[in-house]
UniProtKB/Swiss-Prot annotation:
InterPro entries in the record: N/Namide_PRibTrfase, NAPRTase_N, Nic_PRibTrfase, Nic_PRibTrfase-Fam, Nicotinate_pribotase-like_C
A GO cellular component annotation in the UniProt record: cytosol
Modified residues (Phosphohistidine): H242
Pathway membership: Cofactor biosynthesis; NAD(+) biosynthesis; nicotinate D-ribonucleotide from nicotinate: step 1/1
NCBIfam families tied to this protein: NAPRTase, PRK05321.1
GO terms, biological process: NAD biosynthetic process via the salvage pathway
Annotated family: Belongs to the NAPRTase family.
Post-translational modification, as annotated: Transiently phosphorylated on a His residue during the reaction cycle. Phosphorylation strongly increases the affinity for substrates and increases the rate of nicotinate D-ribonucleotide production. Dephosphorylation regenerates the low-affinity form of the enzyme, leading to product release.
The protein's name in its UniProt record: Nicotinate phosphoribosyltransferase
Catalytic activity: nicotinate + 5-phospho-alpha-D-ribose 1-diphosphate + ATP + H2O = nicotinate beta-D-ribonucleotide + ADP + phosphate + diphosphate
Source organism per UniProt: Rhizobium meliloti (strain 1021) (Ensifer meliloti)
Biological role: Catalyzes the synthesis of beta-nicotinate D-ribonucleotide from nicotinate and 5-phospho-D-ribose 1-phosphate at the expense of ATP.
EC identifiers of the protein: 6.3.4.21
Amino acid sequence: MPKTDIARRVYNHTWKLDPIVRSLLDTDFYKLLMLQMIWQLYPDVDATFSLINRTKTVRLADEIDEQELRDQLDHARGLRFTKKEMIWLAGNSFYGRTQIFSPEFLAWLARFRLPEYELSRRDGQFELTFRGRWAETTMWEIPALAIINELRSRAAMKGLGPFTLDVLYARAKAKMWSKVEQLREHPNLRISDFGTRRRHSFLWQRWCVEALKEGIGSSFTGSSNVLLAMDNDLEAVGTNAHELPMVAAALTRNDRELAAAPYKVLQDWNQLYGGNLLIVLPDAFGTAAFLRDAPDWVADWTGFRPDSAPPIEGGEKIIAWWKKMGRDPREKLLIFSDGLDVDTIIRTYCHFEGRVRMSFGWGTNLTNDFAGCAPTEINGLNPISIVCKVSEANGRPAVKLSDNPRKATGDPAEVERYLKFFGSEDFVEQSVRV
C-alpha cells in the first residue's frame, strides 16, 4: 500500500467534502458478529442508540460545526457494502472458520444501509440518536464515534500550517514508535488494534496498524477494524460487546428473567459461534454478580475480557473463579482492553506471565495519543471519553453498570434498580479518561 503524507493530506482540505467513513467495513469486527446474531435471533427488536460524552468539560457542539457533522453522517448513510467487500466476507476465514457468515445473512447485508439519525444541540453538546430495528441501529455506533472524533481533530488542526502539521505528525510517529520498541522487548506478548471508535483519524489509525505490523511482527495479532484487516491482510479480531446483555436485560419481564439475561445471551452466542469466539464479557452488571451466579458451563468457555476493573485486579478475580470452578487458568485466555497504554500492557503481561494465556486490545492510547506532539498545546487533540450506547430496547430503558460506577449508563432510576438487584460488590471508582 502506498504511504500517505498525513500532514500534507490534512492541510490540503480544498474539496467540498472529505469523507471520514468511506466504507461500511470501517467498523469493528464484533459489530458484524453481533449483527448476524441480532439479525437471526432478534429481528423484530427495536433499539435506540444515543451518544454520550462523559468528558463534560469538552463542549462538542462548540468545537464541531453542526453542518459538517450532518454532511459526514449523510455521506455514511449513502454507503453500501461493495462487491469486493462481500466476496471477502464470504470467502475469508475468521478465527480459523470459513463461512462464519451465513449466505442468507450476507444476502441481507448486501442491501444494508445505515438508518436515519436525529441530531440536535443542547448546552454545548450534541444529542445524536439512532432509532429503529436493532439490526440497523447497532451499525451506527462505530462510524458515528469515528466521525465525531475525527471532526474534532480536524477542527483542532484547522489553523495549523503545513510545517507545523509536519512537526506534529513527526513527533506523534516518534512517540508511537518508542512504544513499539518497548513492546519488542516482550516477544511473547500478543497485541491487537482496538482503536477505531476514538481514533484521531482513519489515516492515523492505518499508520499505527502498519507500524505495529512492521515493528512487532507476529506479536501483532490483528485489528478490530474490518477494513484495515482486509486491506493489510490481517486477522479481523473481536468478540462481543455490552449491548447484548443490555438489550437482553431490558427485554425481561420479571426478576427471574433479569437474573438469567447475562447468561441467555451467551447461550445465544454459542448457537452461532465457538472456539476462540467464546469470550465472556462479564461486567455489564458487575463482574462479581456475574461470577456469583454463573452456571458451570461458563467456565468451559475459552476466556474472559475484563473490561472495566483495573486489569491486574480484574484478572486475578477471574483466575480465582476458574480455580474455584476446577479449571486450569493456564489453559484459559484473558483479553485486556480497557484504557490500556504500553506501560499498563507490559506491567499486566509481566504480572500474569506463565499463569494464563493473554491478549491485549490496544485502543485510544494507540490511535489517539498526541499529547505533547504539537508545538503549542492544543486541547482539541486530547482524547475524550465518548461512547454510543444502547439506551432503549422496545421502548424500555437499557442499563450498563460496569465495575467502574463512572461508566454506568442509563436512566438514573433504572440504574438504581439494577444496583439493588445485582449489587455493587467490588465496584471500584476510577477516573475515565478514554
